[in-house]
Amino acid sequence: MLKSIFAKRFASTGSYPGSTRITLPRRPAKKIQLGKSRPAIYHQFNVKMELSDGSVVIRRSQYPKGEIRLIQDQRNNPLWNPSRDDLVVVDANSGGSLDRFNKRYSSLFSVDSTTPNSSSETVELSEENKKKTQIKKEEKEDVSEKAFGMDDYLSLLDDSEQQIKSGKLASKKRDKK
């Protein structure tokens, strides 16, 4: 009885006469070991990238957008074109909310504090304060450059330090087969 079932099963081709059977290639069926999973395969789209000089390049990207315009790229970046003097680094956030926040609240976080007076006095005081702060900053930079030298780096390599020895070292164990 079983033979007749198997014979009928293997006798049928599974397709109607005249058709060709198409087989798709499959990945080899391997046992996936622990920690050896297959990498994820991501779909990639063809994206037209418009560079800053107007040229268009087609690239493959995972971002599903047809066209992307770049503000700054290798055509107008001073790192890629060191011989061009007309290039300036463009801040992408210059018109953003972070820049507006810095403009509005930068006076709150400044080190120098001034008391509000009449407008003419504040203008004169602010100019004097700016000059004083510039002089102080220059002096601090000079002192900091002179104070820190190669000896400070060598002091980090002091021989009196000892390594802390505690705990057990992990040892590799061979798998028994």
UniProtKB/Swiss-Prot annotation:
Residues 87-177 are annotated as: Sufficient for dosage suppression of COX2 mutation. It is found in: Mitochondrion. The keyword Ribonucleoprotein applies. Residues 111-144 are annotated as: Disordered. Residues 36-118 are annotated as: Sufficient for general mitochondrial translation. Disulfide bonds: none annotated. Residues 127-144 have a biased composition (Basic and acidic residues). GO terms for biological process: mitochondrial translation. Component of the mitochondrial ribosome (mitoribosome), a dedicated translation machinery responsible for the synthesis of mitochondrial genome-encoded proteins, including at least some of the essential transmembrane subunits of the mitochondrial respiratory chain. The mitoribosomes are attached to the mitochondrial inner membrane and translation products are cotranslationally integrated into the membrane. Overexpression of bL31m suppresses mutations in the COX2 leader peptide-encoding and initiation codon regions. Component of the mitochondrial large ribosomal subunit (mt-LSU). Mature yeast 74S mitochondrial ribosomes consist of a small (37S) and a large (54S) subunit. The 37S small subunit contains a 15S ribosomal RNA (15S mt-rRNA) and 34 different proteins. The 54S large subunit contains a 21S rRNA (21S mt-rRNA) and 46 different proteins. Belongs to the bacterial ribosomal protein bL31 family. Highly divergent. Contains two functional domains. The central domain is sufficient for general mitochondrial translation but not suppression of COX2 mutants. The C-terminus sequence is sufficient for dosage suppression of COX2 mutants. This is Large ribosomal subunit protein bL31m.
